């Protein structure tokens, strides 16, 4: 049994695993200007940007800096949004009572010192659902933080996957 454990240790010892981030130290500062918004929904750009910044802080690899002092700049644009009715309330005719909200962002990651594009126009999509309870605007506003959180996690994952 001891020889099996030693053999297993020898084999697994050959596997490479890094603790921490593989992002080079000189590239661990990032700026995230407010996302552009072509989604057709006002205010979602600021909310998504705020959640992306929070997610970078939570994840911990990058320090948030202003554009002039960061090594990387993440540019984002909300390029598409869709509302799809999922269920209807029979008491109010054919009015939808639940919707799926989809939001697509396009991100570009630039190494500021060289201008090199590390990510170029990568599209990332997030979805959430919401109930209208008779008020579409309130339902949408309630959905904004959920979709922003999901989208921000996918955006940060895409940036980290570059390394």
Residue ranges and their predicted role:
Residues 36-41, 134-144:
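Second-shell loop/turn segments in exported
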Residues 18, 59-63, 69, 73-118, ...:
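Surface-exposed short loop/turn segments
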Residues 140-163:
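Compositionally biased, intrinsically disordered linkers/stalks adjacent to structured regions
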Residues 1-14:
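Sec-dependent bacterial lipoprotein signal peptides
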Residues 12-54, 58-69, 113, 123, ...:
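A structural "domain/chain start" motif
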């Amino acid at each position: 049994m001891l020889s099996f454990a030693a053999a297993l240790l020898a084999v697994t010892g050959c596997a490479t695993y890094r603790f921490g981030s593989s992002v080079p130290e000189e590239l661990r500062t990032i700026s995230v200007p407010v996302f552009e918004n072509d989604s057709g929904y006002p205010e979602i750009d600021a909310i998504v940007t705020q959640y992306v910044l929070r997610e970078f802080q939570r994840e911990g690899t990058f320090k948030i800096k202003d554009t002039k002092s960061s090594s990387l700049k993440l540019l984002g644009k909300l390029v598409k949004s869709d509302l799809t009715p999922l269920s209807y309330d029979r008491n109010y005719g054919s009015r939808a009572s639940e919707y799926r909200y989809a939001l697509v962002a396009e991100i570009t990651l630039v190494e500021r010192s060289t201008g090199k594009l590390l990510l170029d126009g990568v599209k990332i999509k997030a979805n959430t659902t919401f109930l209208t309870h008779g008020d579409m605007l309130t339902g949408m506003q309630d959905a904004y933080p959920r979709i922003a959180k999901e989208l921000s996690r996918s955006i940060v994952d895409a940036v980290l996957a570059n390394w």
